[in-house]
Every structure is written in C-alpha cells, then in structure tokens.
C-alpha cells in the first residue's frame, strides 16, 4: 500500500503570461512517518516529437515527512524559450508534476497547457520567430491525468513490479472525459493530445 496519497493539486495564477512562474498548491497525506525525503519535480514538455526537449523546471526535497496531511506551494520558473522548437512554441503541450521516494517515481500528474497570443493580429498572423513575451499560458486545470506507480516503500523487501493505475480517490479531480476543444482555442486534435500525454504519462 502506498504510504503517500496526493489528495489535491490546485493550479494557481492561471491563465498567466508565458514568463510567469508555474505555481501548484499540492496537498498530500502520509499514512506513517517517512524516514527519507520526497522529491517533487515540475517538468515542461517542450515538444511532442522528442523527450530531449523536456525541461525540468525545478525539483524540491520535502522531508523527512511525519504522518498526517501536508500542503505546500510548488513554484518553478517558466521554461527556457531557447530550448523549445519554434514549431512547438504556440499551441498545446504538457506540464508534469512527479514525486519520487528513494529514487522511485510513484505518482505523475499531467496537465495540458495551451500557449497562444492574446492579440488578434498575432493570432491571425503569427511571427515566424515566436514572441514569447506576447504569449499567454493557459493550463487545463480541470482535467489532469494522474498515473500512480507501485514502488518499494521499505528497505527490506524486493522491488515491486512496476504498475500504474488511476487514483480512485481523486476521480473528481482526474476526469479525462473532457479534452480541450477547438471552440476554446485549443487547436490540437484530441488524438494527438492523447498520444503526447500518454507517452509522457506511461514512461518511468
């Protein structure tokens, strides 16, 4: 049984300009004291074409963590535009929150992110070279995708077989029925969105 359950994630300052920091309010619960730190990361997917464009925006160690419910705000700087392919700067991508214990990832929360120009002229006639200062970031906060992995929480047991499952306790938070629609300015097709998110949610 997992010793840590993520109860809720709230996306703060959303939507916001591209260069604003990412901010997530994370609430989690430990069923018993943890002797080692939890490592949290925020990862920005720079391109659906290759993971080489993924950027770890920040990582933080939390712990040792006593049993009980805990909440903290995880903030990370915006991604480095120089590491994002021009073709992927505008449109839909993904941001991930991961947590590991003893070097083993046990939960991954993924959100769709839409980067678009707020000015009509720029939307209709986008510059060849993206102008990140004019982009607005909008995280689809209502529809995260959560994947959990079985890990070895103890020192004296063999490593468990890796597996993943949706967290039933977060069903209201994790509904994947609704995806971004073109009517809301999310122009990427549902199929390509699913492929992009699945590829990052299923890897360890």
Swiss-Prot record:
Effect of residue 49 to A: Loss of interaction with TLK2
Compartments in which it is found: Nucleus; Chromosome
Listed GO MF terms: chromatin binding; histone binding; histone chaperone activity
Pfam families referenced in this protein's UniProt entry, alphabetically: ASF1_hist_chap
GO BP field: DNA repair; DNA repair-dependent chromatin remodeling; DNA replication-dependent chromatin assembly; muscle cell differentiation; nucleosome assembly; osteoblast differentiation; replication fork processing
Gene3D superfamilies: Histone chaperone ASF1-like (2.60.40.1490)
Region (Interaction with histone H3, CHAF1B, and HIRA): 1-156
Record PTM: Phosphorylated by TLK1 and TLK2. Highly phosphorylated in S-phase and at lower levels in M-phase. TLK2-mediated phosphorylation at Ser-192 prevents proteasome-dependent degradation. Phosphorylation at Ser-192 by PRKDC in response to DNA damage promotes the histone chaperone activity and ability to replace histones at double-strand breaks (DSBs) at stalled or collapsed replication forks, leading to RAD51 recruitment.
Motif Required for interaction with HIRA: positions: 31-37
Location of Phosphoserine modifications: 192
Expression tissues: Ubiquitously expressed.
Outcome (variant: residue 37 to A): Abrogates interaction with CHAF1B and HIRA
UniProt xrefs under InterPro entries: ASF1-like, ASF1-like_sf
Record keywords: Chaperone, Chromatin regulator, Chromosome, DNA damage, Nucleus, Phosphoprotein, Transcription, Transcription regulation
Gene Ontology cellular-component annotations: chromatin; nucleoplasm; nucleus; protein-containing complex; site of double-strand break
SUBUNIT field: Interacts with histone H3 (via C-terminus), including histone H3.1, H3.2 and H3.3, and histone H4; the interaction with H3 is direct. Probably interacts with the heterodimeric form of H3-H4 taking the place of the second dimer. Interacts with the CHAF1A, CHAF1B and RBBP4 subunits of the CAF-1 complex. Interacts with CABIN1, HAT1, HIRA, NASP, TAF1 and UBN1. Found in a soluble complex with NASP and histones H3 and H4; the interaction with NASP is probably indirect and mediated by H3-H4. Interacts with CDAN1. Found in a cytosolic complex with IPO4 and histones H3 and H4. Interacts with CREBBP.
Family designation: Belongs to the ASF1 family.
Chain's role: Histone chaperone that facilitates histone deposition and histone exchange and removal during nucleosome assembly and disassembly. Cooperates with chromatin assembly factor 1 (CAF-1) to promote replication-dependent chromatin assembly and with HIRA to promote replication-independent chromatin assembly. Promotes homologous recombination-mediated repair of double-strand breaks (DSBs) at stalled or collapsed replication forks: acts by mediating histone replacement at DSBs, leading to recruitment of the MMS22L-TONSL complex and subsequent loading of RAD51.
Name the UniProt record assigns to this protein: Histone chaperone ASF1A
Organism listed in the record: Homo sapiens (Human)
Source lineage: Eukaryota, Metazoa, Chordata, Craniata, Vertebrata
Underlying gene: ASF1A
